[in-house]
UniProtKB/Swiss-Prot annotation:
Cytoskeletal linker protein. May promote and stabilize the formation of the actin and microtubule network. Keywords: Actin-binding, Cytoplasm, Cytoskeleton, Microtubule, Phosphoprotein. Residues 299-694 are annotated as: Disordered. PANTHER family: GAS2-LIKE PROTEIN 3, TRANSGELIN. Residues 663-683 have a biased composition (Basic and acidic residues). The GAR domain modulates the binding strength to each cytoskeletal network. One of its GO terms (cellular component) is cytoplasm. Interacts (via CH domain) with F-actin. Interacts (via C terminus) with microtubules. Interacts with MAPRE1. This is GAS2-like protein 3.
């Protein structure tokens, strides 16, 4: 203990750049562990005067040498404390026989061979504490048995012994020197309060010499030298009485080497007091906590490299958030954000999944259409069809059919038909839901190629012409059946079975085989869109512009279960034609179409009559058309059933379709009336059944 205190408080400690302060100020905060150690040593240093005083007092009472440095080790087994009880009781009896009656006298049991830290040591300590309570020691001065046995609370042990000295001093027993100094100070304070400073000066200071005390105070006050404007002033008032800053305190010399300051009911060293109250020295203590915290933060920032968790990670693109972004930027060309295929599958489970290859090959037509569209963001995002597909999936979580239609709608609406995007984007979520109800008829007709082509139109129409677009798609189905009766029937059955949710978008696919007829349909659909939606007619115009893609590409797109934008170009044309034909009946048949969609079943269950036909055609679900030619009625039925998740498209059917569709395109012009009659009859039957429901 002594060497450590000498190191911290001695005058020979060399100063280093890291600890520029004098030893009395401590080592500074360059090393927190070293500073903590110094704080502990400083606390022990303030205890050292009490340790020495108590060791001298106990040595005199017990007649044995008690070392101040090992005071706790001497007391921790409780044997000396029990012996102290016997000595004090005997001294009280001999010193003051009259007052001894008030002092409790009793035999305290003691295990004299108790080992340090043992249960018997705790038992001895507990017996001592019980006696302390009997003689009137206040609870504030008492300590726990563990505090002494394990050396946890030395200060409290010393304060308890000092309190015992105060109590026994009333019975004529010599107390510790600190207790004597307390009595002198109390007497001086009493004289100061009653008379004046002159009387207090006459009080004999038995424990200190005036000259030595004053020199010691001056030395401590001037070390280190301070030239601060707010220098802490120490003013001499009288012998042992000084003004320290704004406080008047009593200072005493203990055993000729410790300058002690009476603070409250206890004692502190003058050095420790100045460290706490001197503005020049308080820096290391009053702001100790803040400084240590700041220092630790600085160390952690400098030494610990930024962990990956700390480094800001780019936010993960949320499909819905991406959709919202596109809606806001619908007027501007936007690049869709690519989404993992796994996410795409989740977005459009039924038939919305579109492999990258199909997007590239199957969507060529749709890409060209988008690029041609004046405002379509797709023009700028042709290479990112995959991402657009992923985006379309995002708003379509509500249902498989809706998701598939949205898959086609979103890429097209966002990429293909930017003019309608402002309107379509906000309603994308609504259109998918509506598409669910109306996809039934278009589902059978939905073909990957038309999906992308029709998507622009449908995306343009979803908000305003949801009702009209549905009839148009129905017309598309009829027209395509006329042009491509066999191929359309196969396409309807395939798309309906495979792409239940993307029927509308798939319906334009039927026109795939007949690129010419699809082009015509796109023209008509553009006209109908213009009449029905006004601004939506622009995307339809863009759709006819889309270049048709070979039937093989359309087949591959269908096989890949991807929205075939290429094939969609031709279906777009066909759909446009059908839309032109159905524009007149669109307004009339909208309720019918809605009711028909409701009848169709799964699609009507989701949102019967809500989804516009344009929305239905929008979905770019990858559906493989089946070659099996069916009647227009079977096509419509299959379209209704296609609302279920699109099954893996049949590649052979799709392969067959292109040629058949080409033939149908030729025959579509010749036999449009017959197919129209069949389709119209079936359509009217469906509508009639739904009208009574409405």
């Amino acid at each position: 203990m002594q060497p450590a205190i000498q190191v911290w408080f001695g005058e020979d400690l060399p100063l280093s750049p890291r600890s520029p302060l004098t030893p009395r100020h401590g080592p500074g905060l360059a090393n927190v562990c070293q500073y903590d150690e110094w704080i502990a040593v400083r606390h022990e240093a303030t205890l050292l005067p009490m340790q020495e005083d108590l060791s001298i007092w106990l040595s005199g009472l017990l007649g044995i040498k008690v070392k101040a440095e090992k005071l706790l080790e001497e007391l921790d087994n409780g044997v000396l404390l029990c012996q102290l009880i016997d000595v004090l009781q005997n001294m009280v009896k001999t010193c003051n026989s009259e007052e001894s009656g008030n002092f409790p006298m009793r035999k305290v049991p003691c295990k004299k061979d108790a080992a340090s830290g043992s249960f018997f040591a705790r038992d001895n300590t507990a017996n001592f504490l019980h006696w302390c309570r009997d003689i009137g020691v206040d609870e504030t001065y008492l300590f726990e048995s563990e505090g002494l046995v394990l050396h946890k609370d030395p200060r409290q042990v010393y304060l308890c012994l000092l309190e015992i000295g105060r109590i026994v001093s009333r019975y004529g027993v010599e107390p510790p020197v600190l207790v004597k100094l307390e009595k002198e100070i109390e007497l001086e304070e009493t004289l100061l309060n009653t008379s004046g400073p002159e009387d207090s000066i006459s009080i004999p200071k038995s424990c200190c010499r005036h000259e030595e005390l004053h020199e010691a105070v001056k030395h401590i006050a001037e070390d280190p030298p301070c030239s601060c404007s707010h220098r802490f002033s120490i003013e001499y008032l009288s012998e042992g009485r000084y003004r320290l800053g704004d406080k008047i305190l009593f200072i005493r010399m203990l055993h000729g080497k410790h300058v002690m300051v009476r603070v409250g009911g206890g004692w502190d060293t003058l050095q420790g007091f100045l460290l706490k109250y001197d503005p020049c020295r308080i820096l290391q203590f009053a702001t100790l906590e803040q400084k240590i915290l700041a220092f630790q933060k600085g160390v952690s920032n400098e030494s610990v490299p930024d962990s990956p968790a700390r480094t800001p990670q780019p936010p993960e693109m949320n499909p819905l958030s991406a959709v919202n972004m596109f809606q806001k930027q619908n007027s501007k060309p936007s690049v869709p954000v690519s989404i993992p295929k796994s996410k795409e599958k989740q977005g459009r489970p039924p038939g919305a999944l579109v492999p990258a290859s199909s997007l590239k090959g199957g969507n060529l037509g749709s890409m060209s259409v988008r690029s041609k569209l004046p405002n379509s963001p797709a023009a700028s995002s042709h290479p990112k069809l995959k991402s657009s597909k992923g985006i379309t999936k995002k708003p379509q979580a509500p249902s498989n059919n809706a998701s598939s239609s949205l898959a086609s709608l979103n890429p097209v609406g966002k990429n293909t038909s930017s003019p309608a995007l402002p309107r379509t984007a906000p309603c994308i979520s609504e259109s998918p839901r509506k598409c669910i109800s109306s996809p039934n008829t278009p589902k059978a007709k939905v073909i990957p190629a038309q999906n992308s082509a029709d998507l622009p139109e449908s995306t343009l129409l979803p908000n305003k012409c949801s009702g009209k677009t549905q009839p148009k798609y129905l017309k598309h189905n009829h027209i395509s059946s006329r042009d491509n009766a066999v191929s359309h029937l196969a396409a309807h059955s395939n798309s309906s079975s495979k792409c239940p949710k993307l029927p509308k978008a798939n319906i334009p696919v039927r026109p795939k085989p007949s690129f010419q007829s699809s082009a015509k349909m796109t023209k008509t659909s553009s006209k109908t869109i213009a009449t029905g939606l006004g601004t939506q007619s622009q995307p339809s115009d863009g759709a006819p512009q889309a270049k048709p893609v070979p039937a093989q590409k359309l087949k591959s797109a269908l096989n890949l279960n991807q929205p075939v934008s290429v094939s969609s170009v031709s279906p777009v044309k066909a759909t446009q034609k059908s839309k032109d034909k159905n524009i007149v009946s669109a307004t009339k048949k909208q309720p019918q179409n809605k009711s028909a969609f409701q009848k169709t079943g799964p699609s009507s269950l989701k949102s019967p009559g809500r989804t516009p036909l344009s929305i239905v055609s929008l979905p770019q679900s990858s559906t493989k058309t089946q070659t099996a030619p069916k009647s227009a009625q079977t096509v419509a039925k299959s379209q209704h059933s296609t609302k279920g998740p699109p099954r893996s498209g049949k590649t052979p059917a799709s392969i067959r379709k292109p040629p058949s569709s080409v033939k149908d395109a030729d025959s579509g012009d010749k036999k449009p009336t017959a197919k129209k009659k069949e389709d119209d009859d079936h359509y009217f039957v469906m509508t009639g059944s739904k009208k009574p429901r409405k």
